Amino acid sequence: MIRVAINGFGRIGRNFARCWLGRENTNIELVAVNDTSDPRTNAHLLKYDSMLGKLKNVDITADDNSITVNGKTIKCVSDRNPENLPWKEWEIDLIIEATGVFVSKEGATKHINAGAKKVLITAPGKNEDGTFVMGVNHHDYDHNLHNIISNASCTTNCLAPIAKVLNDKFGIIKGSMTTTHSYTGDQRLLDASHRDLRRARAAAINIVPTSTGAAKAVALVIPELKGKLNGVALRVPTPNVSMVDFVVQVEKRTITEEVNQALKDASEGPLKGILDYSELQLVSSDYQGTDASSIVDANLTLVMGNDLVKVMAWYDNEWGYSQRVLDLAELVAEKWV
């Protein structure tokens, strides 16, 4: 079992903690949290969540220096500079880097300098040792080579399993993606300054077009797709659950039924638990709290001219993604030597 600390107790940090609390027989131990908020505030936000509801059957208390969950003490510290954190003293093995700030190798290395052994970035990284999407390229993780790793983005985690199935089965020539994405904390509640003039506009009353590197990032986990994919995002006035609209030109001629069958087979086989498949007539709120990275909405699959394929898939961009962060952390623990 390895000792884990969370840096940044925001949406992903707290979702990760809840995932960890709910998982049996995990091989990681959550021992510390670094966040700018105080332990009592963080304990309250962990217990009461607008999306996830109240954390039931869990006793949570806090004091000036820790949060206690069912008798288990999680140490708390508050320092914006990772190099000042007591990771060596607390014998921390792995940092879950969830601030969205220290996403570069240079930034994440500050945790290593403070005594941690490895860092898992919960966002697209910059010059990291490796990016891994569970179910797609997680088998490439090498304990001896990969000390600063990225779990990619929630959208890449939704898109990559579908891209893998379509590329393996039909061969992707090129493609584009649009994610209809719930608003996030990076946007403004009311109009206010932002480096992205569209994200500067009120999130809860606008459809906000913005950039995303999620499609290009697929090439980090499926190298043969480098230069073949791109995409955009539409941030919409919902607090959680998003949807990918993926359109590709394929080499092998096909029909809608064959595409859906390939996706269904993958969801029941090699990608079980990562990719899900649904023929139900559902809407976004029905997928709140879904563990899978990607849920194909089979009724929306289209094929035009036997070579233009459109697949749409839901994803819980907080909970589903946090489950994959935990999966990757457990993989790191499994490979620890």
UniProtKB/Swiss-Prot annotation:
Gene Ontology BP, a term: reductive pentose-phosphate cycle
The keyword Aminoacyl-tRNA synthetase is annotated on this UniProt entry: no
Residue numbers annotated as active site: C154 (nucleophile)
Binding site for D-glyceraldehyde 3-phosphate: S153, C154, T155, T184, R199, T212, G213, R235
InterPro entries the record matches: GlycerAld/Erythrose_P_DH, GlycerAld_3-P_DH_AS, GlycerAld_3-P_DH_cat, GlycerAld_3-P_DH_NAD(P)-bd, Glyceraldehyde-3-P_DH_1, NAD(P)-bd_dom_sf
Subcellular location: Cytoplasm
EC top class named in words: oxidoreductase
Predominant subcellular localization, coarse grouping: cytoplasm
Stored CDD domains: GAPDH_I_C (cd18126), GAPDH_I_N (cd05214)
UniProt keyword annotation of Membrane present: no
Binding of NADP(+), residues: R11, I12, D35, R80, T122, N317
GO terms of molecular function: glyceraldehyde-3-phosphate dehydrogenase (NAD+) (phosphorylating) activity; glyceraldehyde-3-phosphate dehydrogenase (NADP+) (phosphorylating) activity; NAD binding; NADP binding
Pathways involved: Carbohydrate biosynthesis; Calvin cycle
Coiled coil: none
Annotated site (Activates thiol group during catalysis): H181
SUPFAM superfamilies per record: Glyceraldehyde-3-phosphate dehydrogenase-like, C-terminal domain (SSF55347), NAD(P)-binding Rossmann-fold domains (SSF51735)
Reaction equation(s) it catalyzes: D-glyceraldehyde 3-phosphate + phosphate + NADP(+) = (2R)-3-phospho-glyceroyl phosphate + NADPH + H(+); D-glyceraldehyde 3-phosphate + phosphate + NAD(+) = (2R)-3-phospho-glyceroyl phosphate + NADH + H(+)
GO cellular component: cytoplasm
EC number(s) stated in the UniProt entry for this protein: 1.2.1.59
Keywords for the protein's UniProt record, in alphabetical order: Calvin cycle, Cytoplasm, NADP, Nucleotide-binding, Oxidoreductase
Function: Gap2 has a major role in carbon fixation as a component of the Calvin cycle. Catalyzes the oxidative phosphorylation of glyceraldehyde 3-phosphate (G3P) to 1,3-bisphosphoglycerate (BPG) using the cofactor NADP. The first reaction step involves the formation of a hemiacetal intermediate between G3P and a cysteine residue, and this hemiacetal intermediate is then oxidized to a thioester, with concomitant reduction of NADP to NADPH. The reduced NADPH is then exchanged with the second NAD, and the thioester is attacked by a nucleophilic inorganic phosphate to produce BPG.
SUBUNIT field: Homotetramer.
Family: Belongs to the glyceraldehyde-3-phosphate dehydrogenase family.
The protein, known as: Glyceraldehyde-3-phosphate dehydrogenase 2
Organism from which the protein derives: Nostoc sp. (strain PCC 7120 / SAG 25.82 / UTEX 2576)
